[in-house]
Amino acid sequence: MGARASVLSGGKLDAWEKIRLRPGGKKKYRLKHLVWASRELERFALNPGLLETPEGCLQIIEQIQPAIKTGTEELKSLFNLVAVLYCVHRKIDVKDTKEALDKIEEIQNKSQQKTQQAAADKEKDNKVSQNYPIVQNAQGQMVHQAISPRTLNAWVKVVEEKAFSPEVIPMFSALSEGATPQDLNAMLNTVGGHQAAMQMLKDTINEEAAEWDRVHPVHAGPIPPGQMREPRGSDIAGTTSTLQEQIAWMTGNPAIPVGDIYKRWIILGLNKIVRMYSPVSILDIKQGPKEPFRDYVDRFFKTLRAEQATQDVKNWMTETLLVQNANPDCKTILRALGQGASIEEMMTACQGVGGPSHKARVLAEAMSQVTNTNTAIMMQKGNFKGQRKFVKCFNCGKEGHIARNCRAPRKKGCWKCGREGHQMKDCTERQAKFFRENLAFQQREARKFSPEQARTNSPTSRELRVRRGDDPLSEAGAAEGQGTSLSFPQITLWQRPLVTVKIEGQLREALLDTGADDTVLEEINLPGKWKPKMIGGIGGFIKVRQYEQVAIEICGKKAIGTVLVGPTPVNIIGRNILTQIGCTLNFPISPIETVPVKLKPGMDGPKVKQWPLTEEKIKALTEICTEMEKEGKISRIGPENPYSTPIFAIKKKDSTKWRKLVDFRELNKRTQDFWEVQLGIPHPAGLKKKKSVSVLDVGDAYFSVPLDKEFRKYTAFTIPSINNETPGIRYQYNVLPQGWKGSPAIFQSSMTKILAPFREQNPEMVIYQYMDDLYVGSDLEIGQHRAKIEELRAHLLKWGFTTPDKKHQKEPPFLWMGYELHPDKWTVQTVKLPEKDSWTVNDIQKLVGKLNWASQIYPNIKVKQLCKLLRGAKALTDIIPLTKEAELELAENREILREPIHGVYYDPSKDLIAEIRKQGQGQWTYQIYQEPFKNLKTGKYAKMRTAHTNDIKQLTEAVQKISTESIVIWGKIPKFRLPIQKETWETWWTEYWQATWIPEWEFVNTPHLVKLWYQLETEPIAGAETYYIDGAANRETKLGKAGYVTDRGKQKVVSLTETTNQKTELQAIYLALQDSGLEVNIVTDSQYALGIIQAQPDKSESELVNQIIEELIKKEKVYLSWVPAHKGIGGNEQVDKLVSSGVRKVLFLDGIDKAQEEHERYHNNWRAVASDFNLPPIVAKEIVASCDKCQLKGEAMHGQVDCSPGIWQLDCTHLEGQVILVAVHVASGYIEAEVIPAETGKETAYFLLKLASRWPVKVIHTDNGSNFTSAAVKAACWWADIQQEFGIPYNPQSQGVVESMNKELKKIIGQVRDQAEHLKTAVQMAVFIHNFKRKGGIGGYSAGERIIDIIATDIQTKELQKQISNIQKFRVYYRDSRDPIWKGPAKLLWKGEGAVVIQDNSEIKVVPRREAKIIRDYGKQMAGDDCVASRQDED
């Protein structure tokens, strides 16, 4: 560290530590930043010594600067640090990083001209090239020095470790400094195994080479003598030029830097590859259920910076996607904050919010009163009939449970003889001799388990075990027992438990019988007196002699008791002796199958150092871990495990006990992702009414499930010692740890598998499972129901899951998942709003959480005003004064919660009805019921998805939200009762350009009816004045103009400041509305303004739009039309010139007429128009929008579908009384469609076979129509090896892709229908247009191009996988020039013409082909002295 920290010294270091990281920030640069920068430079193969001089800093800046745009945050931080360091070296006074960057930019701009002039002078002087690969020999000739294996090795390492992440580009730039095209090709060949990436790179090089040839045409005529030919594109790429030609071009006068040109092409290709290999889209950034909001915002903006989009689009993404992709808890608060909230306000409002922990806090407070009451009642009901006798487990040594309930692991090995290496069925021992040492007897320590032991190794049979009982022995027995090493036999019941026993010194073979009361032996001579007795058995009564005080020894354990001697068919040791020696009948826990877990590819386990802990925390952790080790939950490990995760301890709430916490954040980052088994919590409104109900809780849920053996090493942690007195104690987990990301998913999956057999055997039992909470309901009588519950508990216990009695709820009301369940109704657990004189931010957050929870059954609850209080950057402890509106809202909510409200249970035989009511201020409430005044569920909706909206749009959004919620809870959509008249709805619906599906509904006359405040005409108004409006603004000066020209000669222009083009267009509409009569025609060339007004908003966040709405309401009739700009339309051209004067430059474009002509024929979308005719997107959109057939509706809104190349969706749609069968390739959007004679299975199967003969079809997804479920379709699927999947009934979203394509196809058919006589012709024309004349989506392709690209890529990927698997069958023996001894075998990674890339242990090397021998790996074989690597067959 000393060497690295010596970059600055004395006064320079003082100056360095005064510079701030950010303008106005508190943090300043420190010495540690220089140490970090040195390490980063080593990673990028740059010399850290360059930091010591200003010249070196400039060199680093020149290397890093080209990669800043695509680089990571670490790369940008490194660039900023070097810029500041340069200023310190040069003694340039800067206060923060931003000033330093400005200085660097200024210096670079000033020196640019000097550098160019110096370069020109250098060329004139014809000095020797100093480029590294081209050197001057002793004769003065320019010769090539081949790129070194060390450089190639470094490049291969970069690609293998970074996997084409953004850091690859600066590394390539640094390693290829001054290289010739031949050197660059050598570098590319060493990573040729990445075929997909290399193909992309090759395509980019070919495109750039073609562009070079186009820009540099060949000169006519022969080349003059002594003059070199000019390089073509293929010459620069090194394919048609020699090394000597490349050197001549690079060192000539004037020089043609073919190496640098080719390098630039490669970097362009690498940029494309980086984007492909790091496909992080802003749409994929979503907040996890437990992720803090601040972390989510950091990830969001990090990805946003990398997005290729304009600033306007990025602003829109911030306003819309940031809230949309937040988790439900944060989303509720963010939406209540409204559109105008800043990032700081959002982050303050969402402090400590989100995930189950937040819900738990809300529920815990709501339950506090109930829990306290119940605890008191339980204590009063306690039965204190006598002191309970404690039992002790002989498996782990702990008191309080017996061995069959023990969770500690069982010992491995044969269950009969105890030895490892074979199973019981292969055992040759005649009788059990499985002795365990260190019994858990009284006054003895529990046996220790080996670290690798786990429950997964436990036997699955019943077994008989012998242990020391509680009954006291005689003095002789006790004395003798104390001197004997006690052992522990374990006998399985696969065979009869026969053992050899010693009775008064005589050996006999006897059966251990736990069902027999007495010990009965065949004829044996025993000393002492006896008395006659008659005993009953299965075969009748027999006469026996009864001997008292007989000494018996069984498996080394002694007992004294009564023995009966008589004609018994087999010697029996009964319970009178077995209880003395502590024999028990055990039911070992069945093994739970472990789920295999891996780290993310290319990652290693966490190596985070343990931070120091206080003495009391170390003592607490030591005690906790000792207990956990005894129970088998964790195991001790040695120094061979290199991984580490920090642990700490906190005190439990309202307790003196400590709780162990493990900081698994680093491991969670490195662990593979898991699919959430359960996407939400079950809701009581979806429960069916049941006669009998029970609620169970699984104790120590995670610790009952074993962790994958191969993954355990990564959970290692250390308990340090005080003052480092001794090395820390190291442990690893054997079971699922708390806080690890995989625990919830694995536990849910394991629990589901375990419950599956019980569910199959007891279909009458309904089990709702969420984590460790179980709701069990049935229509059985209470006695039968409770018997089944005990069966379920026993079933769970067999797998190691205990269900504690204290959490077993048998009588209503049942407390479950935060709800209170009664036999015929349900409610949320008691919600009490606190009474406070002053409210902090944290108090209001908790209050909003409680109210949101209560709103699912209490109607009309509002939180908007309370959420407004959370705006602004405030700390959690800041006191917030309540506004009058918030106080009123809180008082109303208190009144609503005063009377308890209950919901009822679902009846499948009755219809669902959803009624929505408007509350005003953009807030809505809804009630879902089956009978009036008996609500199943209530809720509220207060979203404002766009800046300008109206009540009808909000109502539509609320309907869609309730539909989705209903499908999740009940599996069907309710009938809706909406506060809007049919006429109002139809008027808006037919005009609204982006209409979406909503279900069946009827009008309900409730207060706050929804209505349209104004209506736009569909045709021009005869006799009304026509206003041609326009607006323009200058982006730099923010100055603008808005105005109009009328058909009657009126005109007006106003000047505006601090405005934009969009604002001026809206201002022009406002001017026209202000100055016009009650009826007016308005013509605009702005799609933006037209889109806002045509949606008929009645409220907006924009003050200007609200003013426009007020003017529209005053008018009797308004007609608003759009015309394309700059097309010579009279009034539009006049007003354009009027407002453009001195503000903007008008751009006239060629190709518009051809684009319009093609659009009129094919009705292609705007992306295809822009691509085919090289037009800007805004012009292409205007052409499409001006088409009367394409202006009916907007384009479909695209979602995200996870799909593979072989999946197709099929559906039938109807048009003109005929059936059209449509097939859509999900991944590409490619369509195949035909008009079929009838909707039958036969026609469908024939269509499916035609589809399979043209395209690779692996899976088809259809609805449950009779033609798709027919035997003919099943037969076709069987023959063509196609898997058929079905959608969800009543759920249109399950067939979303094909449903969307049906609408799209019908729209295109409508556009071309007048060009065809028959429908079947129009269908094929529409399919052609969709597949080949509409571009967009992934890659900007048409659907036809995209499907071919996807299939070709799939084939290439499969071939690549085959090659990789084939090449891994070979091993390489190699040597280098310095050491003639052969080394190996190493793993073959890639084989080229002149060299091979190998992996020896963890090191990747490039070895010349002549120094390597490649040998097929035939597995492990015994090699003799004459078996030498060089004699084997080479590849």
UniProtKB/Swiss-Prot annotation:
GO terms, biological process: DNA integration; DNA recombination; establishment of integrated proviral latency; proteolysis; symbiont entry into host cell; symbiont-mediated activation of host apoptosis; symbiont-mediated suppression of host gene expression; viral genome integration into host DNA
Biased composition (Polar residues): 109-118
Region called Interaction with membrane phosphatidylinositol 4,5-bisphosphate, residue ranges: 73-77
UniProt name for this protein: Gag-Pol polyprotein
Positions of region (Interaction with membrane phosphatidylinositol 4,5-bisphosphate and RNA): 14-33
Essential cofactor(s): Mg(2+)
Zinc fingers (CCHC-type), renumbered ranges: 391-408, 412-429
Species lineage: Viruses, Riboviria, Pararnavirae, Artverviricota, Revtraviricetes
